[in-house]
């Protein structure tokens, strides 16, 4: 028979998968199939155009266009750290002003920002590191809940802090006042997992 931990984990996986599938289907219907109007006020969030997200749609589109015109070396390793503003002002300054009335020196999407500045190799490595860290913390939380470990609240807090940061990074940029807290909570979560693993081995 399946253990409680396994059943709990499978239930969460199914729930998360169904949630992502529902959002994916809504986006397909609203954008590719052109049925955005049927969602009423929700179309503001579902339909992607240059005006969505306070003009984030514009800079996201231009970011992907800029990346598509990169030479091979830049497509692999990016244009250089913190050079997004140079890219946009050099190639899309007039278009930015005409379309949005402002200048974008960031992509307002941390993953797009990394894609253009440090390249897909570094971006993939970063995302794998975050996802693996969350996976290790999630496994610990499930085991700790069953064993009623006193460290559960700390582990849950660290896990969801990292997950929330990962989701908000789709519409924001990494800031010096915020990003250090990601690494602090991530380190605390991993340290908790390591401590639990060491005690278990002993």
What are these regions (language model features)?
Residues 47, 52, 105, 110, ...:
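Membrane-helix boundary/interfacial segments in multi-pass membrane proteins
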Residues 61, 111-114, 163-166:
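Structural preference for long, well-ordered alpha-helical segments in enzyme cores
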Residues 1, 129, 137, 145-201:
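Transmembrane alpha-helices of multi-pass inner-membrane enzymes
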Residues 1-72, 81, 86-90:
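A membrane-periplasm/extracellular boundary helix in multi-pass inner-membrane enzymes
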Residues 5-12, 30, 39, 120, ...:
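Polytopic membrane enzymes that build or remodel cell-surface glycoconjugates and lipids
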Residues 26-35, 77, 84-98, 163, ...:
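Membrane-interface helix-loop junctions at the exits of transmembrane helices
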Residues 76-77, 95-137:
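A conserved mid-to-late transmembrane alpha helix and its immediate loop/hinge
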Residues 55, 59, 99-107, 159-162:
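Juxtamembrane loop-helix boundary motifs flanking transmembrane segments in multi-pass membrane proteins
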């Amino acid at each position: 028979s399946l253990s409680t931990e396994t059943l709990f984990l499978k239930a969460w996986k199914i729930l998360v998968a169904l949630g992502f599938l529902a959002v994916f289907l809504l986006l397909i219907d609203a954008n590719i199939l052109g049925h955005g109007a049927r969602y009423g006020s929700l179309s503001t969030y579902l339909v992607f155009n240059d005006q969505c997200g306070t003009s984030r749609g514009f800079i996201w589109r231009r970011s992907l266009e800029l990346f598509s015109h990169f030479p091979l070396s830049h497509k692999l390793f990016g244009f250089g750290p913190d050079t997004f503003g140079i890219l946009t002002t050099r190639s899309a300054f007039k278009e930015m002003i005409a379309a949005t009335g402002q200048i974008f020196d960031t992509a307002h999407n941390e993953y797009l920002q990394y894609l253009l500045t440090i390249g897909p190799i570094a971006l993939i490595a970063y995302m794998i590191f975050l996802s693996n860290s969350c996976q290790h913390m999630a496994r610990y939380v499930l085991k700790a809940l069953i064993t009623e470990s006193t460290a559960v609240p700390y582990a849950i807090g660290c896990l969801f802090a990292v997950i929330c940061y990962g989701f908000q990074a789709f519409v924001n940029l990494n800031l010096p006042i915020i990003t250090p807290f990601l690494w602090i909570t991530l380190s605390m979560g991993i340290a908790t997992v390591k401590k639990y693993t060491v005690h278990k081995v002993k």
